[in-house]
Design a protein with these regions (language model features):
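Conserved ABC ATPase "signature" region
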Residues: 137, 141, 149-167
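Conserved ABC ATPase signature
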Residues: 171-178
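Helical segment within the ABC ATPase nucleotide-binding domain
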Residues: 211-223
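ABC ATPase "signature
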Residues: 256-257
Length: 283
């Protein structure tokens, strides 16, 4: 063998293992990345070590939880616990935070831009100079983005969800609080989002109106396999509506799981008693 061929052979014998090592590392990184992606896709919502600071105050101090697709999931806690801040982050409204948040594999802002998320704040009210129908028509037009058939589909579903009968054609200034709330939740859900985020959906409602709203939430979740995240102070409502919950206090998770599991684990009679024990201690 010529000295040139011998030298080339030696170079190859040294470089081939290095090349194979680099390829192997790249392949393993690819597999690892895809494995993470597949794990993300198993959940509608993934939250890990979520932190939010406003001014000098830490509002969220490392929240972690996952929400499965088609699940009605509750975020509960006392006033000031960080519920609304969490919901606003999940909805893509609050953009600056620390931690990991994915909505169907996307960050909240991307998911919002794709129309995956619909958010109903606690203080939402309809335009009172318009009728109920005109309110729904306005938002159906907005969400359909010029697609006539899609607008008609949204509008039809919105009228159905609100279940206001002939009152749908009255000015909303004449509506009771319960009727206004039904219209707002119809406006939120009629676009059939992949994720609906509802902040205190039955707040300050009479019993009949609250029951109507709860039934709407369950019906939409089941009919469209919609993932719904809601906050509530009403533990009876949470037990009735939610598949699982996360209870937060002072920006931290203090319990997570099915309502009945939390009741059992705290040796409580019901979720309200469990809530009191977990937040305020045995009294």
């Amino acid at each position: 063998m010529s000295p040139y061929l011998s030298k080339a052979s030696n170079v190859l014998s040294l470089t081939v293992p290095i090349i194979l090592y680099i390829i192997s590392k790249a392949y393993n990184k690819f597999l690892s990345h895809n494995s993470i992606s597949m794990t993300e896709k198993q959940f509608a919502v993934s939250v890990t070590n979520l932190r939010k600071r406003i001014g000098n105050k830490d509002i969220l101090k490392g929240l972690s939880f996952n929400v499965e697709n088609g699940e009605v999931f509750g975020i509960v806690g006392p006033n000031g616990a960080g519920k609304t801040t969490t919901l606003r982050i999940l909805s893509g409204i609050i953009k600056n935070f620390e931690g990991y948040v994915k909505i169907f594999g996307l960050n909240p802002v991307e998911a919002k831009q794709k129309g995956y998320i619909s958010y109903m704040p606690e203080d939402a009210f309809p335009y009172e100079k318009l009728t109920g129908y005109e309110n729904l028509d306005f938002y159906a037009e907005l969400y359909a983005r010029g697609e006539k058939q899609l607008k008609e589909k949204y509008l039809k579903l919105g009228v159905e969800i609100s279940n206001l009968g002939k009152r749908i054609y009255d000015k909303t200034a004449e509506y009771s609080r319960g009727m206004k709330r039904r219209l707002i939740i119809a406006r939120t859900l009629m676009v059939m989002p992949k994720l609906s985020v509802l902040d205190e959906p039955t707040s300050a409602l009479d019993v009949e109106s609250a029951v109507r709203i709860r039934n709407i939430i369950l019906d939409m979740a089941r009919r469209y396999n919609m993932t719904i995240i809601l906050s509530s102070h009403n533990m009876l409502e949470v037990e009735y509506l939610c598949d699982r919950i996360t209870l937060i206090n002072d920006g931290r998770v203090v319990a997570s799981g099915k309502p009945e599991e939390i009741v059992k684990n705290t040796n409580s009679k019901n979720l309200e008693e469990a809530f009191i024990k977990l937040v305020f201690g045995d009294q």
